[in-house]
Amino acid sequence: DFILEELEEYKEACEKGDIVGILDALCDITYVSLGNGALLHGLKGKVWEAYQEVQASNMSKSCETQEIAEQTVILRAEEKGHPCHWEQVGDRYVVYRSSDNKVMKSINYFAPDLKQFFTDEELRQTTGS
């Protein structure tokens, strides 16, 4: 219920164009989500490190150099059969599928490894193994 309440506040702030309200709602959504996850599921001490792992994974979707972007364009087009193009966004390069501008993963993309934050015993307890 807390998260839904914060989402409603976010929606209202967006509709009003209230940038301070938007920031407040986003912070509250994050706080409620991470705080409840940590407390209700015994994840205290894991959430921040896991968040950083997910952030690093998401950042690996973009390319650090134009050369990597060009290589990604070629590879993704060959793999998927769809033409792709890249654009510079800030100091990064993002590869898009040309037909719908879907972001394509860089050749250097890596999936987040969230299991690293658990001991073998913790994983056994949650999977029932």
Question: What would you call each of these model-derived segments?
Answer:
Residues D1-S129:
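Flexible "arm" and connector segments at domain edges
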